[in-house]
């Protein structure tokens, strides 16, 4: 599954999302909307108003959403429970 995370400089929720995805071993592409303004415009056109925006297959969301990350891959401790 292809995962893309749209971020911006100095975005605390973006950093938290990146860490959570790395901790679960996901491969993902990051696009910084400060460097790619047309990406920001495209996200706004899709109704997103907050970063990060994560697009993972058929799922997409904005903000730091551990619940959505867990839908992609449960946290290690959840798998053993």
Swiss-Prot record:
Keywords: Disulfide bond, Electron transport, Redox-active center, Transport. GO terms for molecular function: electron transfer activity. Residues 1-81 form the Glutaredoxin domain. PROSITE patterns: GLUTAREDOXIN_2. The keyword Transport applies. It comes from the Bacteria. Disulfide bonds join 11-14. GO terms for biological process: cell redox homeostasis. Pfam families: Glutaredoxin. Induction: Induced 2-fold by hydroxyurea. The keyword Cell inner membrane does not apply. Belongs to the glutaredoxin family. NCBIfam families: GlrX_NrdH, PRK10329.1. Electron transport system for the ribonucleotide reductase system NrdEF. This is Glutaredoxin-like protein NrdH. It comes from Escherichia coli (strain K12). The lineage of its organism: Bacteria, Pseudomonadati, Pseudomonadota, Gammaproteobacteria, Enterobacterales.
């Amino acid at each position: 599954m292809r995962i893309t995370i749209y971020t911006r400089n100095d975005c605390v929720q973006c950093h938290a999302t990146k860490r959570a995805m790395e901790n679960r071993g996901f491969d993902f592409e990051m696009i910084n909307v400060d460097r790619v303004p047309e990406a920001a415009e495209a996200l706004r056109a899709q109704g997103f108003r907050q970063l990060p925006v994560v697009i993972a297959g058929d799922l997409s969301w904005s903000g730091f959403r551990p619940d959505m990350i867990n839908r992609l891959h449960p946290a290690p401790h959840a798998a053993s429970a």
